[in-house]
Amino acid sequence: MAMSGRELVVYRERLGRFEEVGFVGTSEVALTFSYSDSYRRNDSAQSISHALPLGAGELPPSAVKSFFDGLLPEGSMRRVLSASFHTSEDDLHELISRLNDESAGALVFKVAGEDPAWGRGYEPMGDFDFERLAAFPREFAPHAAVRSRLSLAGAQMKVGLHFDAATGAWQYPKGAAPSSHIVKACDGGFSLQTINEAVCMATAVRLGFDAA
């Protein structure tokens, strides 16, 4: 089903290949989403959210907005990204199209006709990129997000990276290449935020829980 307004094709990666899931577009008043007919006929098809069921007809705009809004950064991270894209913080369609390799839900958003696997690979980090992230998180984290086109949900300044165990090198994921680590930086008035998280995770390990 074609959507009104600009259209993005939604893919999911399964068993080493990309499957077309549906379409994201815009109407005069809201973000829109529908599952593709081919995906509905797929025996392995699953809804991308309980709030967006496969068998439904027209999906409620409020549910569509809530789901896709939840895939995007929040707070100061979104403000900085929106400014760099010269768009509104509320323009979900534009933000998704710019940060189109969503990492949490295994979804990829591409313009119709664009290969979802195009540009997949890794780019080496600069020698001082970690120092820049720690010293200037507000400036560096959005820059890295634009560079890798990963959409990391939440309000913290964070960067999705890949560690190559064979070479010991840190890399930026490109295209739909997966990240192996999410690196966070302190932001604003919470200067010890990441230290607090590290202490909590270390405590969890000491108590017998599995934690990274």
Question: Which role fits each region the language model picked out?
Answer:
Residues 1-212:
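Phosphate/dinucleotide-binding and metal-coordinating scaffold of catalytic cores
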